[in-house]
Amino acid sequence: MAKLTKRQKAIAAAIEANKVYTLEEAVQVLNNLPAAKFKESLDVSVNLGVDPRKSDQVVRGATTLPAGTGKTVRVAVFAQGAAAEAAKAEGADIVGFDDLAESIQQGNLDFDVVIAAPDAMRVVGKLGTILGPRGLMPNPKVGTVTPDVANAVKNAKAGQARYRVDKAGIIHAAIGQVGFTAEAIRQNVETLVADLKKLKPATSKGVYIKKITLSSTMGPGLTVDVNNVTN
C-alpha cells in the first residue's frame, strides 16, 4: 500500500468523514490546507435533479460572478465595424474577422473565451473542429454569440462560470481561488445557484438542487449543506 505524503496526511487530518459543512466552514478548511505549488482554484459541483439524456433537461449557461474568479481572462472577439470598436473599448484582447479565423487555423489559440457577433458565425462556424473540442465555440445559450459583444466582453473579463450538465446530472464550475474570503465565495455560489434555478427545465421533477460540493484543485471535495446556500 502506497504511503501517504505529508500533504495527504494533513488533508486527511483536516476533514471529517461524512460531515456536511456550512459554506463558510468548507471555505475555511480548503483555505487552511497545505498550499500546493500553484494557485489552486476553488470549484463547485452541483448535482441536479435532471435526466441529461433528455434534450429538454440539458442545463447549460453562464453566470457572471460578483466576486470574480481571480483569474485573468483573455478574450477573442469576432466582430467588425462599430461592434469591433466597442469590444476593444471594453478590453477585448484580440478582435478580428476573417483575419482572426485565419490566425486560429494556423494554431494561434492564446485566449480563454471566444465571443462572436451573429454576422460572424458564417466565419466562426468553419472553426468548429478547432474550437469545439476545446470548449471555445461561441454559443448563444451562454451569451457568447450576441449582437452586444461589448457587454459579453465585460462579463467575461469580470469573471464568469460557464457550465453544462454532464452525463451524471452534475454541473462543475470554477468559483474562485484558494485565498478567497468566505463572503466572496458565498456571493459567487449563491449567484450561480440562483441562475441554475432559473434554468430549471419544466420537465424536471422532484428535488432540483440535490447536492453541493466545494473543492480545491488538489484538495478534497466537501459536501455543503444545500439549505445553507439556497435559503
From Swiss-Prot:
GO terms for biological process: regulation of translation; translation. GO terms for molecular function: rRNA binding; structural constituent of ribosome; tRNA binding. The lineage of its organism: Bacteria, Pseudomonadati, Pseudomonadota, Gammaproteobacteria, Moraxellales. This is Large ribosomal subunit protein uL1. It comes from Acinetobacter baylyi (strain ATCC 33305 / BD413 / ADP1). Gene3D superfamilies: 3.30.190.20, 3.40.50.790. It holds the Pfam family Ribosomal_L1. Part of the 50S ribosomal subunit. InterPro entries: Ribosom_uL1_bac-type, Ribosomal_uL1, Ribosomal_uL1-like, Ribosomal_uL1/biogenesis, Ribosomal_uL1_3-a/b-sand, Ribosomal_uL1_CS.
